[in-house]
């Protein structure tokens, strides 16, 4: 099955639209002021207070203890972590805060993909482009080196026209943000169209 995580959400109406049209996860960027999608803690608390059955994801780069402590009482089911943390540190974060972990790896080569083996504690491995928010992609065929029992997420300039091809590689979660924006703001029409396309692909696969 193809699932979708919509990342970089910053307004209640956008979260509501994601919930309405079937996103599996809603992502919120924290402690990363370089990004126009970065949220204050107050805003993150507001956006994650909505009652729904989807998963809220705190997206962070190399979070420190103080930052992790500051969000421990917010309604997050997953922490998505970028950076070069030791696998033991990832395991400690998971146990201490009782959350599921999405470990992000930046991908350029096969060797980058194989780094997933280090992070046994991660619930999901995110394979992202080296550009992070710079709208770059990577060769998705590299994911053939990852066993099917590893739960996978893919990011990096994913467009609506890419969904059919990605869905044929394997069951996967697509992590999308910039493709659903107009002038650096989430576009409700683009969110709707993207999520309806995901739904269409899944329905066609069951026929």
Regions found by a protein language model. Give the residues of each.
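Conserved N-terminal beta1-alpha1 strand-loop-helix module at the mouth
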Residues: 1-207
């Amino acid at each position: 099955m193809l699932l979708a995580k919509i990342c970089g959400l910053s307004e209640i109406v956008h979260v509501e639209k994601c919930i309405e049209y079937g996103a599996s996860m809603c992502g919120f960027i924290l402690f990363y002021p370089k990004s126009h999608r970065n949220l204050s803690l107050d805003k993150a608390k507001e956006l994650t207070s909505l009652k729904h059955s989807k998963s809220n994801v705190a997206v962070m780069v190399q979070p420190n203890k103080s930052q992790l402590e500051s969000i421990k009482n917010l309604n997050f089911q997953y922490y998505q972590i970028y950076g070069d943390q030791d696998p033991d540190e990832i395991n400690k974060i998971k146990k201490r805060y009782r959350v599921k972990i999405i470990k992000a790896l930046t991908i350029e080569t096969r060797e980058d993909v194989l780094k997933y083996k280090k992070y046994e504690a991660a619930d999901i491995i995110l394979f992202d482009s080296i550009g992070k928010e710079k709208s770059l992609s990577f060769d998705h065929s590299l994911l053939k080196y990852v066993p099917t029992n590893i739960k996978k997420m893919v990011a990096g300039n994913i467009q609506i026209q890419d969904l059919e091809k990605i869905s044929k590689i394997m069951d996967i979660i697509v992590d999308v943000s910039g493709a659903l924006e107009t002038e650096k703001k989430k576009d409700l029409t683009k969110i709707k169209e993207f999520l309806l396309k995901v739904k269409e692909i899944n329905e066609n696969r069951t026929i």
